[in-house]
Amino acid sequence: MVREASIVAVVGWKNSGKTGLVERLVGESVRRGLRVSTAKHAHHAVDIDQPGRDSWRHREAGAHEVALVSASRFVLQRELRGRAEPSLLEVAATLESVDLLIAEGFKSSPVAKIEAWRDACDRPPLASKDDTVFALAVEGGSSTLSRHHPRLAERLPVFELGDAEGILTAVVNHLKP
């Protein structure tokens, strides 16, 4: 089970750099000796199985959960079958304990958030209406954000989108009890 105090979500509009930022944060976390997990929210149906495979057949037969296990990987698929999509906190409760859970997406979750933002997204930062965003990772850094959203640039820490070291330090400091 992952404690809520060790969860950060990377949020932002489509093509804002979220996935690349998560990759860099995971790499920097591992470099620092942290044990890290990730959770990714998908806006489309997810199926990692292949039609006709044994695990697919188990699921099609009605299994609630299907565990696929090998010497190098363990995958658990849970069928919702009409139940509500689990929240990030519900997902975190099912994961092994780690130093940090980095989520991609989950904009409506009540956890601490870093926003990835590019002015090419042509949308205002989510941070302008979301108090759980505690910092921004911006392509072009604070000068870019200051040109477009000066109040936000004054109110929140702003990092260059590629500055995984600085962003992770901010995350760790923000999540400290």
Which ranges hold each PLM region?
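Walker A (P-loop) phosphate-binding motif
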Residues: M1-H44, H148
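P-loop NTP-binding site
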Residues: R3-A5, L25-S29, V91-L95, F159, ...
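Conserved active-site and cofactor/substrate-binding residues in soluble primary-metabolism enzymes
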Residues: A5, S16-G20, R24, R53, ...
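Fold-independent oxyanion-binding glycine-rich loops
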Residues: W13, H41-A42, P51, S70-A71, ...
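N-terminal phosphate/diphosphate-binding loop that engages ATP/GTP or pyrophosphate donors
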Residues: R24-L89
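Phosphate-binding/switch loop-helix module in NTP-utilizing enzymes
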Residues: E79-S108
